[in-house]
UniProtKB/Swiss-Prot annotation:
The protein's Enzyme Commission number: 4.3.1.18
SUPFAM superfamilies, per database record: Tryptophan synthase beta subunit-like PLP-dependent enzymes
Record organism: Escherichia coli O17:K52:H18 (strain UMN026 / ExPEC)
One example GO MF annotation: D-serine ammonia-lyase activity
Protein name: D-serine dehydratase
Family: Belongs to the serine/threonine dehydratase family. DsdA subfamily.
Residues that bear N6-(pyridoxal phosphate)lysine: 118
Catalyses which reaction(s): D-serine = pyruvate + NH4(+)
Length: 443
């Protein structure tokens, strides 16, 4: 971006200067609306989410047999919700900032099959595509027991088709493993940020991995191009896919059920704050949409990004969405949070969800490493760096009187609040890689 343009952008949006300086930044969204007002802009409805629920239920018997690790939950891919009181104390001590309410962790980091939040959207979109092909070919009806998809006849049928996706790692892992199990030929286009172990794991499942020296945007674009030349190849578009988004959104009702089981109340007197790591935006956008449908105006969602990859904060704050990238303002998009190393946000998610999100913030790689170490020490839970992005949220919210006033929160409401950090990945990180992460944290 030439200097004159840059200067006028900063004059209009002074916050951009902090982003360019790679400072940890928080922006509370003044444009937040009620669910009733914001919902029409999403272009999807509660019925769409119910359809996704129903599809996952139809596939449950198949998943329970195809992936024995899901048998205990009857083929439903869901994660634990746990309180982390020792981590809450540690954060309060390190940041000298009390966190009112209770701190919880949603362990999508330990979801079966692929060990990340992408086991929601990625697996769902592969299943939706497989179902569509089998229904159209007359090989399946909605009433069937879907475990029949494990038969050689179906393997043979699906082997005529291929799937392609561009990814920094975790989405590729979930789509690659699921597609290969169903019988699709699958190619994952991996950006330079992708971890070697993720590529190796994919190859061990018979997935073709194409590696690029460039970032996420290039990997997606190349994947899209490669798929266009083959009519039997289906490209899963992380930047724009409504199907992926709906796969994530199912988490809302599931979380509501977990809250009910644990006797946790969410209402006007007991607000829920949720902190979601954000890359291109599909995962956190879909989850936030599902949460809004489940808890209405009593849930407040925040997106967390690395200081080197603040694409969604930049896009929503300036209103330019996918028309601007972090590289345009001189930021390098290089971060240890490989799953969040995205320079240009989803145009769909930013525009769909901007009215339903309370805020956006950035944090440095070092902050993520520090918190990764603290969580391992205090709670014995090990995550990958990007999964800690949400952990900085509670103190930002609790420290901001202006945000609390904007939403009219009383001290009592804040005392009754639940702060939920969405842990997005790390359950499958190899031991030696995890030791390297832990060594980088400052205790």
């Amino acid at each position: 971006m030439e200097n004159a343009k840059m200067n006028s952008l900063i004059a209009q949006y002074p916050l951009v200067k902090d982003l360019v300086a790679l400072q940890e930044t928080t922006w509370f969204n003044p444009g937040t609306t009620s669910l009733a007002e914001g919902l029409p802009y999403v272009g999807l409805t509660e019925q769409d989410v119910q359809d996704a629920h129903a599809r996952l239920s139809r596939f449950a018997p198949y998943l329970a047999k195809a992936f024995p690790e899901t048998a205990a939950t009857g083929g439903i891919i869901e994660s634990e919700l746990v309180a982390i009181p020792a981590m809450q104390k540690r954060l309060e001590k390190e940041y000298q900032q009390p966190i009112s309410g209770q701190l919880l962790l949603k362990k999508d980091s330990h979801l079966p099959i692929s060990g990340s939040i992408k086991a929601r959207g990625g697996i769902y979109e592969v299943l939706a595509h497989a179902e569509k092909l089998a229904l159209e070919a007359g090989l399946l009806t909605l009433e069937d027991d879907y475990s029949k998809l494990l038969s050689p006849e179906f393997k043979q049928f699906f082997s005529q088709y291929s799937i392609a996706v561009g990814s920094t790692g975790n989405l590729g892992l979930s789509i690659g493993i699921m597609s290969a199990r169903i019988g699709f030929k699958v190619t994952v286009h991996m950006s330079a940020d992708a971890r070697a172990w993720k590529k190796a794991k994919l190859r061990s499942h018979g997935v073709t991995v194409v590696e690029y020296e460039q970032d996420y945007g290039v990997a997606v674009e190349e994947g899209r191009k490669a798929a266009q030349s083959d009519p039997n190849c289906f490209f899963i578009d992380d930047e724009n896919s409504r199907t992926l988004f709906l796969g994530y959104s199912v988490a809302g009702q599931r979380l509501k059920a977990q809250f009910a089981e644990q006797g946790r109340i969410v209402d006007a007197d007991n607000p829920l704050f949720v902190y979601l790591p954000c890359g291109v935006g599909g995962g956190p956008g879909g989850v936030a949409f599902g949460l809004k449908l489940a808890f209405g105006d009593h849930v407040h969602c925040f997106f967390a990004e690395p200081t080197h990859s603040p694409c969604m904060l930049l896009g929503v704050h300036t209103g330019l969405h996918d028309q601007i990238s972090v590289q345009d303002i001189g930021i390098d998009n290089l971060t240890a949070a490989d799953g969040l190393a995205v320079g240009r946000a989803s145009g769909f998610v930013g525009r769909a969800m901007e009215r339903l999100l309370d805020g956006f913030y950035t944090l440095s790689d070092q902050t993520m490493y520090d918190m990764l170490g603290w969580l391992a020490q205090e709670e014995g839970i090990r995550l990958e760096p990007s999964a800690l992005a949400g952990m900085a949220g509670p103190q930002r919210v609790c420290a901001s009187v202006s945000y609390q006033q904007m939403h009219g929160f009383s001290a009592e409401q804040l005392r009754n609040a639940t702060h939920l950090v969405w842990a997005t990945g790390g359950g499958m990180v190899p031991e030696e890689e995890m030791e390297q992460y832990l060594a980088k944290g400052r205790s």
